[in-house]
């Protein structure tokens, strides 16, 4: 949280498999409500934690999401994250075949992925589907899936992704989308430019030095009322 809000120039990879696999299958903060595990055999009553909500709520300057079955997309996003100045957070939807197999099947399964994945590209319309004719529009204050060519919907009606938008409202809405009602948003959801932590510190130190009353420690010691102690 503090890395994100301070915008320290680092890259963070968050592997989300919705389970604690390394500790033999305990439920995790991102586990779906009701999941049964060794540490909670009757099902968890906790609401799942959202990495995207945390990132955007902490004013992250870069947030992206990929799936572990798409190495080409991961490579592209990793490069973009490395080139970004500030903290980048990439959520990797990862399958745990031992303790939580197929947890993201509704997004990654071969037979559904074309209709359940929306790859976001800055400046391009939010289109998806086998024929790339499904899209996202704003219906009042909510997102809605539509089909181009139906109900007088034209391609021009589809939202254009703007990852550089300072206001995170739409970014948060996109990040929350999940099947079956919506496709899951993949790619770079948010990428805004703001000063990094070290840039802010350096700028502050430079200003204080330039405007300091005393330029050296010697000037400080010789300022004001002074006296000598003689033996």
Description of each model-found segment:
Residues 29-81:
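Conserved thiamine diphosphate
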Residues 11-16, 91-93, 189-191:
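Short beta-strand segments
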Residues 61-117:
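ATP/pyrophosphate-binding catalytic subdomain of soluble kinases
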Residues 98-231:
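Flexible, low-complexity linker and terminal segments
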Residues 18-33:
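Glycine-rich anion/phosphate-binding loop at the beta-strand->alpha-helix junction
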Residues 5-11, 15, 59-60, 84-87, ...:
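Short coil/turn connectors at secondary-structure junctions
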Residues 3, 28-32, 81, 106-109:
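Short, hinge-like loop/turn segments at secondary-structure boundaries
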Residues 1-21, 73-76:
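Thiamine diphosphate
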């Amino acid at each position: 949280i503090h890395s994100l809000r301070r915008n320290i120039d680092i890259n963070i990879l968050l592997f989300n498999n919705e389970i604690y696999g390394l500790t033999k299958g305990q439920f995790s903060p991102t586990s779906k409500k009701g999941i049964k595990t060794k540490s909670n055999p009757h099902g968890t009553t906790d609401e799942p934690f959202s990495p995207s909500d945390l990132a955007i709520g902490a004013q992250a300057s870069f947030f992206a999401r990929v799936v572990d079955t798409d190495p080409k997309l991961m490579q592209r996003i990793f490069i973009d994250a490395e080139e970004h100045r500030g903290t980048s957070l990439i959520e990797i939807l990862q399958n745990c075949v031992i303790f939580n197999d197929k947890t993201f099947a509704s997004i990654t399964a071969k037979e559904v992925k074309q209709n359940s994945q929306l790859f976001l590209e800055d400046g391009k319309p939010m289109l998806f589907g086998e024929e790339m004719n499904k899209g996202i529009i704003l219906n009042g204050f909510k997102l809605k899936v539509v089909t181009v060519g139906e109900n007088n919907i034209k391609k021009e009606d589809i939202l254009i992704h703007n990852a550089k938008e300072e206001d995170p409202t739409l970014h948060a809405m996109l990040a929350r989308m999940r099947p079956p009602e919506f496709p899951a948003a993949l790619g770079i959801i948010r990428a805004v430019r703001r000063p990094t932590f070290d840039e802010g510190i350096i700028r502050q130190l430079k200003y204080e030095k330039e405007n300091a009353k005393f330029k050296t420690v010697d000037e400080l010691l010789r300022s004001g009322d002074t006296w000598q102690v003689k033996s």
